[in-house]
Each structure stands twice: as structure tokens, then as C-alpha cells.
């Protein structure tokens, strides 16, 4: 499948997406840097390799924006949490997803790894999940409470599945959700655009990665985030 966006067209497309959803994107927020956490959802080879049956065509173009956010959070001394969508090789955790999807990402396989360009640092939390939402049957909520998080920035793939499901679950738990339109990707632009509209209408402030990075930098004490 051909990508609906490239690194060269991303800025223009992202501005168009924000303009399109502006009637719904009516809850502007600024990051509370001291209580913010970045969630990087499923940036794995399984979803970003063009040869994969689950290739996410919009994923490669947004990788630099995800990297921008990772660097911004690390530079501000704020936590970065990664997720990996995996299933046990014995298939016992597949459930309906076995029937719904072609192929699955097996725990321990090379395809299950996060792409090297975005790899977690030693000590950074990696959540292993078996369903779309990073909150479902994981320890993510416990970790966030221990971090005293209030603001969550959700990025990664796919916009309309794991990212949206995670954002919804975060909202249900009373977190403020920030969703950068240019740091998430889906299989088609229609799916991406529809998800952004739903997010803006119901449970997230949809903005741009550079705006969020700038807010972190502005809040950093002198000497940090440089």
C-alpha cells in the first residue's frame, strides 16, 4: 500500500487535518510539564516494515516527529513509556484477534522489536500489551499513578486502533490527553482523519508535535532541555 503522507508532505497535510477537525477541536490545553508523560505506541517493525501484512503506510513519515517528542521529553527530564503489541507463541492470548487479523506479532520475534531509530533507553518503561489499549490488562495505570502523571501525550501507530483506544482509556481515567496529529499514523488517510476528528470531539486536544515540544522547552528550568 502506498503511503498517504511522506516526510516532505507531512507539514502541509497535518495543517490540513487540524483545519478539518477544528469544529471539534475545542478544548485547547497546555502541557503541565512537571506532570506530563509521553506514550509511544507500538512503533515496531511489525507495523513499520513494508513487507509486513500489518504495514502501517502512514508510520514511516511520522517517525521523525515521534523522535522529536522522545527527545523533548528526555531533555525535559520527563518519562517516556513505550508499548509493544505482542502475543504469546502458544496462541492462548489471541482470542478474537486471531480471527480478525492476518498474522500476529509474536513475543520474542525480531518483528516485535521497536525500530532502532526510536529504541528505548535502558531503564525506560516498555509495556507489553495484547489488545489495542495500553491500559488493558497491563501495569500502565499503576506506573502512571506512581509517576503522579496528569497529562499524557499519545503518539505512534495505528492512529485509529491502539493510539485511539489508549487515548480513550486515559480519558476515562481522568488524564488530560494530548494527541499530536503529525506523530501518529494509520493504514489510510481516511482512517487517520476520522480518528483525529473523533479524538478531538470526545477526549483529546489534537495539536502538533513541535508545539508540544516547545511547551516542554519553555517549562524547563535553566540548563535543562538544551
What residue spans do the PLM features occupy?
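Short glycine/serine/threonine-rich phosphate/pyrophosphate-binding segments
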Residues: 160-166
